[in-house]
């Protein structure tokens, strides 16, 4: 896991070297006629899809729906997706429900795009277009570089669809930022994680997918019940469960969500909740000197993954082989 985290910068650089192919796909899709975008993925790929959703909605102003593959596989109900943009994200490209959902979407008249690591896979075969992650083989059960790769590949596609030069510039800076992020030391979290009964990971907007991804890794690698949620949702029911044994990890982006996140962070501090904040002038977790809010949700995964891996080893767990899990998960 540790070595694969360190490979993330090169994975992303390799994706961006394929930019002409991504631009060609964007031109062939013809986004202007799409009534909506549907994003399909499970687990970590689903979290990458949440990040993609916010990019699509804020850059393309296109409403995004999260696909429920069981509508196709269990309920056998094909959806009305004519002219929709359907994006499926998968590391292995082999899960039967994702294959079926992609096949059904294409048959319904959607423009289907597969963001996959395994380009020779059933999901890739069913899609009209393929955007490769270029991550190479991943040996650890826990996905890291493929998650970062799928988020970067999705962002690159949106940048081309939108003709967004600012996003393209941020993506150009991303490999170097990922490389620098490997040196960030988040060890201040370790003690709280080791004694926690549960963990809440919160963010807003573009950071929500990463919050959910970090929570998944806490459950998967540290065997610690964790929930990733919107900082806005944290203020509803979940807030009642906060205590000295339920630390909150919060990610703050330097964008339109910053004011709300700052206010919530201050309130949690007053209530003596164990808060670990990344980003902003009040952030306790080491962060890069400058902000790139459109890609920071990707970069923040690097120090988060590293501290989870390190804490797992300190607790006597094998971060590369969590119990009862396999590298490829096939659902129906």
Where in this protein do the model-derived segments appear?
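Conserved phosphate/anionic-ligand binding catalytic regions in large, soluble enzymes, centered on
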Residues: 1, 51-52, 211-213, 217, ...
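Active-site phosphate/pyrophosphate-binding segments
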Residues: 3-35, 129-247, 257, 315-332
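Glycine-rich phosphate-binding loops that contact phosphosugars or nucleotide phosphates
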Residues: 21, 31-179, 204, 239-240, ...
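Short, well-ordered loop/turn and helix-capping segments at boundaries between secondary-structure elements
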Residues: 163, 224, 254, 270, ...
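Composition- and surface-driven signal marking solvent-exposed, interaction-prone regions
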Residues: 214, 262-264, 300, 323
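Peripheral docking tails and interdomain loops at the edges
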Residues: 290-332
């Amino acid at each position: 896991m540790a070595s694969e985290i360190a490979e993330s910068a090169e994975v992303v650089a390799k994706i961006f070297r394929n930019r002409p192919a991504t631009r060609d796909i964007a031109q062939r899709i013809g986004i202007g006629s799409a009534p909506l975008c549907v994003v399909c993925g499970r687990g970590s790929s689903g979290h990458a899809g949440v990040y993609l959703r916010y990019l699509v909605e804020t850059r393309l102003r296109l409403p995004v729906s999260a696909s429920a593959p069981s509508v196709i596989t269990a309920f056998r109900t094909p959806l009305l997706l004519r002219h929709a943009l359907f994006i499926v994200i998968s590391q292995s490209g082999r899960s039967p429900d994702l294959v079926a959902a992609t096949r059904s979407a294409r048959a319904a008249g959607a423009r289907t795009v597969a963001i996959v690591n395994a380009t020779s896979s059933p999901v890739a075969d069913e899609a009209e277009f393929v955007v490769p992650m270029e991550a190479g083989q991943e040996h650890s059960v826990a996905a890291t570089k493929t998650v970062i790769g799928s988020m970067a590949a999705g962002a690159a596609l949106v940048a081309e669809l939108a003709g967004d030069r600012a996003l393209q510039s941020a993506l150009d800076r991303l490999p170097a930022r990922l490389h620098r992020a490997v040196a960030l030391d988040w060890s201040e979290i370790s003690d709280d994680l080791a004694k926690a009964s549960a963990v809440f990971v919160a963010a807003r907007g573009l950071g929500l997918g990463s919050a959910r991804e970090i929570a998944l890794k806490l459950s998967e690698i540290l065997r610690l019940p964790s929930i990733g949620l919107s900082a806005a949702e944290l203020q509803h029911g979940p807030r009642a469960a906060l205590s000295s044994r339920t630390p909150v990890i919060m990610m703050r982006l330097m964008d339109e969500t910053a004011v709300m996140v700052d206010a919530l962070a201050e309130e949690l501090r007053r209530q003596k909740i164990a808060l670990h904040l990344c980003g902003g002038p009040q952030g306790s977790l080491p962060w890069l000197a400058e902000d790139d809010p459109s890609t920071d949700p990707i970069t923040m995964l690097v120090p988060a993954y590293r501290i989870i891996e390190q804490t797992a080893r300190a607790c006597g767990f094998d971060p590369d082989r969590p119990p009862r899990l396999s590298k490829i998960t096939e659902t129906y």
